[in-house]
From Swiss-Prot:
It holds the Pfam family TAL_FSA. Belongs to the transaldolase family. Type 1 subfamily. GO terms for biological process: carbohydrate metabolic process; pentose-phosphate shunt, non-oxidative branch. GO terms for molecular function: transaldolase activity. Transmembrane segments: none annotated. Pathway: Carbohydrate degradation; pentose phosphate pathway; D-glyceraldehyde 3-phosphate and beta-D-fructose 6-phosphate from D-ribose 5-phosphate and D-xylulose 5-phosphate (non-oxidative stage): step 2/3. The keyword Cytoplasm applies. It catalyses: D-sedoheptulose 7-phosphate + D-glyceraldehyde 3-phosphate = D-erythrose 4-phosphate + beta-D-fructose 6-phosphate. SUPFAM superfamilies: Aldolase (SSF51569). Its main location: cytoplasm. NCBIfam families: PRK12346.1, talAB. The gene is tal. GO terms for cellular component: cytosol. This is Transaldolase.
Amino acid sequence: MTDKLTSLRQITTVVADTGDIAAMKLYQPQDATTNPSIILNAAQIPEYRKLIDEAIAWAREQSSDHAQQIVDATDKLAVNIGLEILKLIPGRISTEVDARLSYDTVASVAKAKRLIKLYNEAGISNDRILIKLASTWQGIRAAEQLEKEGINCNLTLLFSFAQARACAEAGVFLISPFVGRILDWYKANGDQKEFAPSEDPGVVSVTEIYQYYKKHGYKTVVMGASFRNLGEIIELAGCDRLTIAPSLLKELAESEGPVERKLAYTGEIQAKPAPLTEAEFYWQHNQDPMAVDKLADGIRKFAIDQGKLEKMISDLL
């Protein structure tokens, strides 16, 4: 009998949410996603030590200023890890812009171009890279500009419908709505502690976004992310892409049986509404206390891990 991972692959593009080379070799995903937390964890893997040493040596050649060396080395390390992953996957690697730039459009664009330049210099073309940006108004504007310049983006930390709508209207390549973190918030802040997969607030959110995009003919790819259990993944089968951590990829591979398509849009394509203004975006996003909390919390957590990574690099310089 076919395992659930193989069955899921027939209807959804499976992406690995990890920087672990061993997991890539084992589960053979189409694409891979990284973030500051994943890069920090990957930096602890012994096989990656040479990538850290190379990044530090390179940074020393670029500048004699210690602070600049830290920035250069962390950028180079993220790209070095991405390059290793690209050897093992046929598709794209997502590399994230520093979360501390989440409210700065100009700086986000500059950092994105810096990362792209490092990939290009290593022989990797833009069509194998996605630049990850937080789905703030400023991050979405940065992505809009980058897309026009041929740099595809993955808009992450997406929790509200307003964020999803603004991303589609900006013409971004892909969004990563966070399923599990939405569930976490409702469990922590509501009376209900258990949800059937079809009623899981994260699943409901991604389903609504998927249907809206397809109904209005938006090309933006919907990639569900941040899963807490197998039920969430199975309930979103048919989503354009799903990025899944190795522990859940393992569970899928070890579970037998078919996976049925749950997401599909069969209706007619309808006219797109007028794009959200900045004021409308903030007002609508602000009406969702979960999204406000989780976006801010996600940016803070990624920034903390970026700081830890820089401290590790600084100590080695």
